[in-house]
Amino acid sequence: MTARKSMAWLLLLILPAGFAGVWRLQRKVNVERDAMYQEQDEVLVRSPKLMKLLTLEYATLAADIYWTRAVQYYGNKHLGEETNLESLWPLLDVATTLDPNLLPAYRFGATFLSQPEPRGAGRPDLAVQLLERGLNANPTYWRLNQDLGNVYYLELKDYAKAGQTYLEGSKKPGAAPWMKVMAARFLEKGDSRETATILWSELLDSSTDEAIKETARINLELLRTDEDVDQINALAQRFVAKTGRPPTSIGEMAQAGLIGGEPVDPTGHPYVIGLDGKARVSSKSPLFKEKSVYRRPL
């Protein structure tokens, strides 16, 4: 019994010390493991020029290695739910410098860079830089215009640049017909009505696709209503200045000598004045429904 008590007391003294030792060992292992992962982020040469000199005729192979490393890096960070993607750009920079024709690196790399954290690096500026480099090296590849236009539209909210980028891509060999359609829509959203009108007119005259021709026709009619409504609203402001209140109808504006006749939309339906005193397409006009379809958010 005495021997058992002695053994129990001995275990009580030894076990805490043993657990403490195991804890310290595990902590050291964790620290070294984290340091190893951190080292993996930094292990490859970051200088594109230096890598170009080192690899010589093996540059294309080295580019594939760097691109593969970029994909693995992005995937591992997501699996570990980490948001620090600071090594992503250097990897893509080296890969596309070593092989300027590595198209997947431009396309998917731009997606990795442009998406907001935690899905991506939150660096649309670097995505633009990467895609512009790709376009310089691959000037006839219209898909890069599509990708660049998407970055301008989705991440930077620059609709005019998105439209111009899509328009440039639409002129390249093999470009999909919808590139010009999207260019026109982006330019409309960016208030570039004149350019959008030219594009829709070209599509109406040149396209052999009846669906595209119908889309072009309706959008041209909607653009005309935009111009008409703006002009009527400008006259409505003069009515307010003259009477101290907004107009309630087009007829009231005509009685005030501000407008002659009854302006109608391209389908022949008169415009109306809403409760807010502003002009709009009549709910009786076919364009009222078309506007809700063709002017939905992109």
Describe each model-derived feature in a short phrase.
Residues Q115-E117, S192-S206, A211-L298:
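Low-complexity, acidic interaction segments enriched in glycine
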Residues T2-A110, S114, E290-Y294:
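N-terminal alpha-helical interaction modules that lie
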Residues R107-F108, P124, W142-L148, A160, ...:
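Alpha-solenoid helical repeat scaffolds
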